[in-house]
Curated annotation (Swiss-Prot):
Keywords: Acetylation, Golgi apparatus, Membrane, Phosphoprotein. PANTHER family: ARFAPTIN-1, ARFAPTIN-RELATED. Its main location: Golgi. This is Arfaptin-1. The modification Phosphoserine is found at residues 5, 36, 39, 69, 79, 132. The modification N-acetylalanine is found at residue 2. It comes from the Eukaryota. Residues 22-35 have a biased composition (Basic and acidic residues). It comes from Mus musculus (Mouse).
Amino acid sequence: MAQESPKNSAAEIPVTSNGEVDDAHEHGYNRDLKHSLPSGLGLSETQITSHGFDSTKEGVTEAGAPQGSSAPPLPCVLSPSRVAASKLTQQAGDLTVPAGGQRTHTKGGPVILADEIKNPAMEKLELVRKWSLNTYKCTRQIISEKLGRGSRTVDLELEAQIDILRDNKKKYENILKLAQTLSTQLFQMVHTQKQLGDAFADLSLKSLELHEEFGYNADTQKLLAKNGETLLGAINFFIASVNTLVNKTIEDTLMTVKQYENARVEYDAYRTDLEELNLGPRDANTLPKIEQSQHLFQIHKEKYDKMRSDVSVKLKFLEENKVKVLRNQLVLFHSAVAAYFAGNQKQLELTLKQFHVRLKTPGVDAPSWLEEQ
């Protein structure tokens, strides 16, 4: 430690009334000094020195023994100093932390992080802007087509298949509605036949003179009710199969058709924009717009071609599945109705067994899918 003359090294050591060093002042100053430094800047990174004979010695002072003394030197003591704290605060304020984590000196100001953080609000705003622009283009295209001013891309063969599918769906929905009405009426008739059979059976027991007559009618009504329940099971199975075909299989295909039509509108909208730009002048301002429009047109053209291919494949598989399902269900419906009105109970039961139709026993819950495996 460099020795200075007594004239320049007036050590300031606060002491108590007992002659001991006042540690409370030292700890309080160190705490204030740490609070005044920015995060990451330690005491080891700061230096306070005195220059000149007449400069004010505040902050760091050296307390040492006089020259020639055998006593060991006293350690450095930090005494509270507002001037030193203000200087350290100014030095710390001139530091910024760049992206690499290194500190560089600036003129002053708060600590700034150079890493760019993506703003979620800006990303959402950009998505909304793109969606609004796309919606505007598609709406303009639809209005132009309805007014007869714009052109639209048409696949005649595919459009004809889609129209037939929609027309068939309406007809199948009508058949489904009528079959449900028949099932409801048949259920009420079977319920009435059961009640009538029970009434005949009760009267056959109480009327000895008409015992046989009431008994025959009771047996007939019970047999009709039993056959009606069998026919009702076949009709309900027919309804369930047609309902799955109409409201799930066909509906799924029509959802794909809807996506195809939306892709067609977008394709025509961006095609129209590209055609309008190509008809205009070509200069330094319009060429970037034409290139961007060409890029967007190509993207929507690929999307349109893909959706058209998907619709064609789905229509093909739907037609095959529809023929297979409806053929089996129509044969079941015809055989069950014919056997019921012919009074052929064995043929009616054989028909249900042939098509794997299970009748629900009254008072017994249907088995779960695990029990059916």
